[in-house]
């Protein structure tokens, strides 16, 4: 493979030279490991570095400074101290299955815990204490020798800690619940080196967070206490259609039928370019019961499917079904060696040297599992929620997209039925979508890193899929399949309504190191917002507009100047959105250019300081300062103040501050796109029956109820402050003109409506545009489905801006 040559060596050398403390770090880690250190430490200069840093997924961008393979939990805290002394981050790795290689980040110390894989089963076989780094196949193999098992996932090489950190999606979950519901306790090493127990009674918030709230986020889990299960004999299903004509009717019927079946039946449909397949596990069911279920499904009436229905399958059969066997064999005859994985179970990469150390399987009475094949994995994850099912048109489009790729892509959709109706077991956990998900859609491609043209085609395909499907189904995604290119806020997409609680847990577990890490969660969202808008500039940016960035006191502005021939001489101040916690003038760059060109106005876009580091009223004061600077910098007597979402809230706040300062005549009008106008806790009592959108549209838009809660918590504005809850300001009547925009499926829909009513009552000249059925900020979505409505929005906005600008 081409990347194993001189370029790779040069890159590794760069890693070493970029971190002069790497020698000190190596010495520190060596002192922790003792005599076995040379066998358990990998540096960029070692021939095993490529193999060691990759994990399962072949990737090229993540180059850690050093990798340390722990064998005892007592080594973890000293390793964290080594990283802190060297001034770098310590990153835990269990299975190494992160599709984005987030378990092997640049410039970090990787603490690999795959050799923390002990299994101690209680005498009554009801519980087991296990090392958190054990791989699922090894766990099942060890438990099988005790005649018991664990409610876990399919892939044998996935590490337990990462699996449970994501929630524990499994093929028994519709009746038995997610894997995290079968965790009784854990031991966690925190950032300050303390090892604590997390359970329902001890550190319950931490126990909540580590189960579904993101692996490696709150500390390094080194041990789990699991509740074990004797899995009953079950019935297994495989249906296969090898013709393209059956793909749509089979997929449609499956999605209509499978999630609605009894909880004991868990299944998936695999959609390929030219065929489709259904796999199912009837937990505790008989062959006759499963056959009756399938006969009533309508699936057998579609085309000519090959049908396999097997009963009496023991646990080994069930776990191997669809992998090494397509039937249920007599006990003891099934080959379950696929589960007998070693701590480092992956295949070689090209001719590179593999890292091997203490690769001992859990069973010596069967062959060791064949190496798990690595490839350049490309993936997308979408939850379909119960209240927003796929339409036939959307389903057909997805099938057409899969069929459009070449055979080398090995593209497929792995779609699972969810609709979990059984009560949650154990104490609450951080997985956000258990009760809401109807189905999960995963799309996978084998990348082509050695073929730039094909790789570009695949990247564009996934990008287009994201832009098409995300606005349709929403942001909900499975955190086990993290996606750097997700087009929604990743925090709320993966953790839903639990984000703020998880941030609070993060603060506690980081102890004295909390502020930088908590802010990083929000900074990551900010970076994601900028990345999305730079990749999908809607409308296309007009490069003919000249720009200049100017730094003011504690903030900055970007000035957009129209060509002299088209200049109107007017000025508008634009304030970007982003929940007061993310964004910059960059995310509205294309919009500001369009306004400048089409209106002839000079646009001054404000870069204000963001929460949670800078809470209310810091950002507002920055915007006031920038507006006053604009009035003094340009030869105008008045200007328009405009913004979107949180930016619209700030625009109202600035205008009303100027009104109270006796400068109201300086503001021609306010243009407020989907504004936040009142804190939910400050809605007047007589208006509460009109303020229902927060819950009606809780999951129908990017700014979900959970996201809004998090934004409000981070910004920390007093609910009744008249410059935040601008609806309550007593001098609304002194605003000259206002333009408001409402989106019908927005959590902020009623903020706009209540503000409209208040302005009309105050006698303020008003223009109001409503977009029923459209989500928050829909005009910025990179979706052809929304293109016509987006263009209409921009035309209406420009007309309103011209009206506001008139004296």
From Swiss-Prot:
What PROSITE patterns does this protein map onto? FAD_PCMH
GO molecular function list: FAD binding; hydrolase activity; oxidoreductase activity
Species this chain originates from: Aspergillus terreus (strain NIH 2624 / FGSC A1156)
Q: Taxonomy-wise, where does this protein's organism fall, top ranks first?
A: Eukaryota, Fungi, Dikarya, Ascomycota, Pezizomycotina
Q: Which SUPFAM superfamilies match?
A: alpha/beta-Hydrolases, FAD-binding/transporter-associated domain-like
Cofactor(s) the protein needs: FAD
Deleted gene: phenotype: Abolishes the production of most pyranterreones, but accumulates pyranterreones 9 and 10.
Q: Name one Pfam family in it.
A: FAD_binding_4
Please state what class of enzyme this protein is.
oxidoreductase
Residue ranges of domain FAD-binding PCMH-type in the record: 60-231
What is the role of the protein in this entry?
FAD-linked oxidoreductase; part of the gene cluster that mediates the biosynthesis of pyranterreones, a family of antioxidative compounds. The first step of pyranonigrins biosynthesis is performed by the hybrid PKS-NRPS synthetase pytA that condenses 4 malonyl-CoA units ato the acetyl starter unit by the modular PKS of pytA. The acyl chain is then connected to an L-serine through the amide bond by the modular NRPS of pytA. A tetramic acid is formed and released from the PKS-NRPS pytA to give pyranterreone 5 with the help of the thioesterase pytI.
Which residues carry a glycan? 45, 106, 120, 242, 295, 351, 419, 699
Specify the inducers: Expression is positively regulated by the cluster-specific transcription factor pytR.
For this protein, the Enzyme Commission number is 1.1.1.-
User: Which InterPro entries does the entry mention?
Assistant: AB_hydrolase_3, AB_hydrolase_fold, FAD-bd_PCMH, FAD-bd_PCMH-like_sf, FAD-bd_PCMH_sub2, FAD-linked_Oxidoreductase, Oxid_FAD_bind_N
Q: What is this protein called?
A: FAD-linked oxidoreductase pytB
Q: Which UniProt keywords apply?
A: FAD, Flavoprotein, Glycoprotein, Oxidoreductase, Signal
* PANTHER family in alphabetical order: BINDING OXIDOREDUCTASE, PUTATIVE (AFU_ORTHOLOGUE AFUA_1G17690)-RELATED, FAD-BINDING PCMH-TYPE DOMAIN-CONTAINING PROTEIN
């Amino acid at each position: 493979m081409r990347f194993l040559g001189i370029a790779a060596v040069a890159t590794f050398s760069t890693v070493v030279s970029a971190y002069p403390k790497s020698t000190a770090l190596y010495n520190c880690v060596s002192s922790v490991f003792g005599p076995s250190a040379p066998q358990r430490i990998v540096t960029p200069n070692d021939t095993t570095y490529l193999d060691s840093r990759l994990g399962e997924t072949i990737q090229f961008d993540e180059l850690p400074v050093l990798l340390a393979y722990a064998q005892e939990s007592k080594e973890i805290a000293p390793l964290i101290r080594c990283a802190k002394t060297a001034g770098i981050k310590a990153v835990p790795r269990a299975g190494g299955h992160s599709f984005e290689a987030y378990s092997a980040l640049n410039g970090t110390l990787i603490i690999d815990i795959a050799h923390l894989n002990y299994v101690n089963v209680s005498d009554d076989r009801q519980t087991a204490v296990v090392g958190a780094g054990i791989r699922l196949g090894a766990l099942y193999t060890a438990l099988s020798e005790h005649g018991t098992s664990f409610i876990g996932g399919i892939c044998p090489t996935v590490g337990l800690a990462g699996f449970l950190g994501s929630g524990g999606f499994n093929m028994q979950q519709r009746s038995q619940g997610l894997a995290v519901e079968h965790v009784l306790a854990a031991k966690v090493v925190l950032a300050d080196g303390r090892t604590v127990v997390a359970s329902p009674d001890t550190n319950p918030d931490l126990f909540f967070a580590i189960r579904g709230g993101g692996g490696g986020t709150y500390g390094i889990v080194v041990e789990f206490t699991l509740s074990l299960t004797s899995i009953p004999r079950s019935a297994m299903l495989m249906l296969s259609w090898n013709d393209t004509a059956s793909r749509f009717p089979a997929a449609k019927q499956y999605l209509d039928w499978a999630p609605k079946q009894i909880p004991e039946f868990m299944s998936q449909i695999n959609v390929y370019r030219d065929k489709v397949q259904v796999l199912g596990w009837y937990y505790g069911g008989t062959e006759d019961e499963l056959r009756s279920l399938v006969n009533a499904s309508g699936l057998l009436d579609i085309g000519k499917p090959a049908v396999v229905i097997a009963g009496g399958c023991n646990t080994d059969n069930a776990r191997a079904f669809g992998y090494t066997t397509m039937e249920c064999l007599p006990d003891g005859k099934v080959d379950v060696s696929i589960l007998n994985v070693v701590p480092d179970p992956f295949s070689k990469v090209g001719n590179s040297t593999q890292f091997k150390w203490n690769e001992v399987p859990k069973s010596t009475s069967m062959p060791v599992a064949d190496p798990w094949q690595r490839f350049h994995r490309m993936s997308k994850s979408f939850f379909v929620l119960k209240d927003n099912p796929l339409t036939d048109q959307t389903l057909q489009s997805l099938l057409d997209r899969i069929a459009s790729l070449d055979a080398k892509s090995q593209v497929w959709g792995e779609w699972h039925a969810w609709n979990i109706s059984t009560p949650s077991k154990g104490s609450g956990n951080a997985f956000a979508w258990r009760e809401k998900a109807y189905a999960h859609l995963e799309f996978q491609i084998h990348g082509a890193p050695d073929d730039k043209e094909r790789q570009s085609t695949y990247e564009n395909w996934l990008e287009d899929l994201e832009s098409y499907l995300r606005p349709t189904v929403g942001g909900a995604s499975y955190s086990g399949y993290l996606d750097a290119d997700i087009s929604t806020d990743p925090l709320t997409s993966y953790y839903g309504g639990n984000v703020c609680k998880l941030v609070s847990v993060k603060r506690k577990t980081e102890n004295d190191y909390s502020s930088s890490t908590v802010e990083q969660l929000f900074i990551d969202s900010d970076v994601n917002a900028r990345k999305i808008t730079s990749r999908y500039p809607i409308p296309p940016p007009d490069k003919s507009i000249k720009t200049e960035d100017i730094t003011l006191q504690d903030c900055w502005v970007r000035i957009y100047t129209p060509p002299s021939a088209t200049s109107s001489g007017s000025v508008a101040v634009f304030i970007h959105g982003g929940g007061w916690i993310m964004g910059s003038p960059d995310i509205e760059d294309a919009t500001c250019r369009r306004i400048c060109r089409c209106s002839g106005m000079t646009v001054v876009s404000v870069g204000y300081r963001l929460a949670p580091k800078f809470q209310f009223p810091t950002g507002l004061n920055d915007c006031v300062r920038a507006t006053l600077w604009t009035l003094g910098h340009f030869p105008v007597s008045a200007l328009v103040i405009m913004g979107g979402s949180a930016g619209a809230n700030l625009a109202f706040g600035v205008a009303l501050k100027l009104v109270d300062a006796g400068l109201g005549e300086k503001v021609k009008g306010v243009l407020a796109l989907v504004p936040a106008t009142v804190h939910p806790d400050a809605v007047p009592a007589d208006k509460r029956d009109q303020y229902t959108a927060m819950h009606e549209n809780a999951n129908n838009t990017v700014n979900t109820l959970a996201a809004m809660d998090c934004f409000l918590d981070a910004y920390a504005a007093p609910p009744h402050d008249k410059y935040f809850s601008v609806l309550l300001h007593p001098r609304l009547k002194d605003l000259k003109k206002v333009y408001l925009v409402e989106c019908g499926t927005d959590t902020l829909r009623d903020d706009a409506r209540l503000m409209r009513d208040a302005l009309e009552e105050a006698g303020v000249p008003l223009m109001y545009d409503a977009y029923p059925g459209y989500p928050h900020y829909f005009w910025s979505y990179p979706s052809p489905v929304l293109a016509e409505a987006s263009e209409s929005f921009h035309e209406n906005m420009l007309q309103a801006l011209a009206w506001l600008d008139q004296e």
